[in-house]
């Protein structure tokens, strides 16, 4: 039972990393100005400005969205909106299919956002490191589970 908070922390860290990558991609697409540096012919820097608001707000926005998804009081209005939809009012089966299609659309949108991240330089190496860390944590948890199960089976047979 002690591993559950660790898994939750790791999942939140992974979500924060993923949200940071997505917010950086969205910031690059938007009209907000990015880092700017002006140089003379001599090579000396004349002016420099950096905008890091999007990266700083990534984790707080993610936590706000998570809180609103978990404790959303507007679930009744969402249900009424599904009932008003012409396709979902035909039958219970159609309502289930409409909500499943909506979920598939959301998953496809998330997958497209992940695919649009450019893995260059440090981002590429960080992604490789995170994958190795996640796989090693899963391996460690699997090993712990196997050891616990083996020990409990030994007590039963004795």
UniProtKB/Swiss-Prot annotation:
Main location: secreted
Motif (RxLR-dEER): 39-57
GO cellular component, one term: host cell plasma membrane
Subcellular location field: Secreted; Host cell membrane
Bilayer topology term: Single-pass type I membrane protein
Signal peptide span: 1-20
Superkingdom as given in the UniProt entry: Eukaryota
Residue spans crossing the bilayer: 127-147
Iron in keyword set: no
Keywords, in A-Z order: Glycoprotein, Host cell membrane, Host membrane, Membrane, Secreted, Signal, Transmembrane, Transmembrane helix, Virulence
UniProt KW Amino-acid biosynthesis keyword: no
Role this protein plays: Secreted effector that suppresses pathogen-associated molecular pattern (PAMP)-triggered immunity (PTI) in host plants. Suppresses both defense-related brassinosteroid (BR) and ERECTA (ER) signaling pathways in planta by interacting with host BRI1 kinase inhibitor 1 (BKI1) at the host plasma membrane, leading to a host dwarf phenotype.
Swiss-Prot/TrEMBL domain comment: The RxLR-dEER motif acts to carry the protein into the host cell cytoplasm through binding to cell surface phosphatidylinositol-3-phosphate. The 39 amino acids in the C-terminus (residues 120 to 158) are sufficient for binding the host BKI1.
Assembly, per entry: Interacts with host BKI1.
Recorded family membership: Belongs to the RxLR effector family.
Protein name as it appears in the record: Secreted RxLR effector protein 131
Record organism: Plasmopara viticola (Downy mildew of grapevine)
